[in-house]
Swiss-Prot record:
This is Cyclin-dependent kinase 14. Transmembrane segments: none annotated. The modification Phosphoserine is found at S24, S78, S95, S134. GO terms for biological process: cell division; G2/M transition of mitotic cell cycle; regulation of canonical Wnt signaling pathway; Wnt signaling pathway. Serine/threonine-protein kinase activity is promoted by associated cyclins CCDN3 and CCNY and repressed by CDKN1A. GO terms for cellular component: cyclin-dependent protein kinase holoenzyme complex; cytoplasm; cytoplasmic cyclin-dependent protein kinase holoenzyme complex; cytosol; nucleoplasm; nucleus; plasma membrane. Belongs to the protein kinase superfamily. CMGC Ser/Thr protein kinase family. CDC2/CDKX subfamily. Residues 103-133, 449-469 are annotated as: Disordered.
Length: 469
């Protein structure tokens, strides 16, 4: 079903520290031209096509970095207690660090923007790219723990961009989340993955320049409450699975799937974004943190302390997002603590045991006496709108499996009967081709939407009027 991403042996941990120093120091040596190959040497350059277990991937090392250069990268020890109540209740908030505009603040009291004809984002080619003065900041979109995102404009070609400005601290070096995101995205070219245009490094900041994307799925669902048009759900889900299949085939996990990390362009394209927590097997790590996915979209195996991650980790999030798009509410909106989150899952899927989930008793935080014993129920009993859409309940049930080994992979999900009424050409597209280049593939107006919001010049007919956990 899904590919296992195994933790690395303990003796390789030293390599991780060396890699962090190498990558962090390397940012100060990046030439200011986008086409410079120095940064490529930092990235994963070859991924084996063999089964993920036992895969040896190749990283090019930078022999030019002096060994006496000590670049400290902050490491924090996790104090995660899965049953400790958080200081505040979990609440739905919009993303502050993805490459999109805050829809509510920009569109209140206005008509939904008209859609534009689809066009693939163009990569900068001018030698002026890579320079800090090549971009103009237009407005602040959000701020996270280590980065601030601005809407910007290229002074070279006038295109809108999203500027993710990462603050550097001399004593700590470059944040490793930034290194991960930049190094992974540099090698990912797909219509359903946000495009990294440029990298700008100064003494104080590291700026990642992304294509500008109009909104995100969270804001889109907030704009259209009560569940999305079934046809639109299908197209969004298809694009999500396309993007995931692409990265999973390269043994990369996203690890932070949630609606606010799924960007929606004004042509209807869905793009995976925010790869700060993404992990490639080629980056050595003794264990993976279990504090990686927002609570509502975190799979039960991770909640129970498993660190043996596979691509199935992402597939649980897909199932949660699928249900949320159809039903109009989060699938498992835990409000108290980890225990409450697990109870909400078990209430629908049944409390696991060794018969239904072999190995569950060996998970660090599984204590049978802590949980009420529930029997599983059909998903339509929990989310009635699944019954209105052909094959939706069956697909959701194959994604929302407590045992990770039983979850459908992204590639297998794309072949599910739920998608059988889509044009066959969608499965023949090249990686960088949008699904909206296929005739008659278009988003439908959401309930209550004014037809004036749909561009008359849209070559695909009716299309998108745009609008968390």
């Amino acid at each position: 079903m899904c590919d296992l991403i195994e933790p690395q042996p303990a003796e390789k941990i030293g390599k991780m520290k060396k890699l962090r120093r190498t990558l962090s120091e390397s940012f100060s040596r990046i030439a200011l031209k986008k086409e410079d190959t120095t940064f490529d040497e930092i990235c994963v350059t070859k991924m084996s096509t063999r089964n993920c277990q036992g895969t040896d991937s190749v990283i090019k090392h930078l022999d030019t970095i002096p060994e006496d250069k000590k670049v400290r990268v902050q490491r924090t020890q996790s104090t995660f207690d899965p049953f400790e109540k958080p200081a505040n209740q979990v609440k739905r908030v919009h993303s502050e660090n993805n490459a999109c505009i805050n829809f509510k603040s920009s569109s209140a009291g206005k008509e939904s923007p008209k859609v534009r004809r689809h066009s693939s984002p163009s990569s900068p080619t001018s030698p002026k790219f890579g320079k800090a003065d090549s971009y103009e900041k237009l407005e602040k979109l959000g701020e996270g723990s280590y980065a601030t995102v601005y809407k910007g404009k290229s002074k070279v070609n006038g295109k809108l961009v999203a500027l993710k400005v990462i603050r550097l601290q001399e004593e700590e070096g470059t944040p490793f989340t930034a290194i991960r995101e930049a190094s992974l995205l540099k090698g990912l070219k797909h219509a359903n993955i946000v495009l990294l245009h440029d990298i700008i490094h100064t003494k104080e900041t590291l700026t990642l320049v992304f294509e500008y994307v109009h909104t995100d799925l969270c804001q889109y669902m907030d704009k259209h409450p009560g569940g999305l048009h079934p046809d639109n759900v299908k197209l969004f889900l298809f694009q999500l699975l396309r993007g995931l299949s692409y990265i999973h085939q390269r043994y990369i996990l996203h690890r932070d799937l949630k609606p606010q990390n799924l960007l929606i362009s004004d042509t209807g394209e869905l793009k995976l974004a925010d790869f700060g927590l993404a992990r490639a097997k080629s980056v050595p790590s003794h264990t993976y943190s279990n504090e990686v996915v927002t609570l509502w979209y975190r799979p039960p195996d991770v909640l129970l302390g498993s660190t043996e991650y596979s691509t199935c980790l992402d597939m649980w999030g897909v199932g949660c997002i699928f249900v949320e798009m159809i039903q109009g509410v989060a699938a498992f909106p835990g409000m108290k603590d980890i225990q409450d989150q697990l109870e909400r899952i078990f209430l629908v899927l049944g409390t696991p045991n060794e018969d239904t989930w072999p190995g569950v008793h060996s998970l660090p935080h599984f204590k049978p006496e802590r949980f009420t014993v529930y029997s599983s129920k059909s998903l339509r009993q929990a989310w009635n709108k699944l019954s209105y859409v052909n094959h939706a309940e069956d697909l959701a049930s194959k994604l929302l499996q407590c045992s990770p080994k039983n979850r459908l992979s992204a590639q297998a999900a794309l072949s599910h009967e739920y998608f059988s009424d889509l044009p066959p050409r969608l499965w023949e597209l090249t990686d960088m081709s949008s699904i909206f280049t296929v005739p008659n593939v278009r988003l439908q107006p959401e309930a209550g939407e004014s037809m004036r919001a749909f561009g008359k010049n849209n070559s695909y007919g009716k299309s998108l009027s745009n609008s968390k956990h």
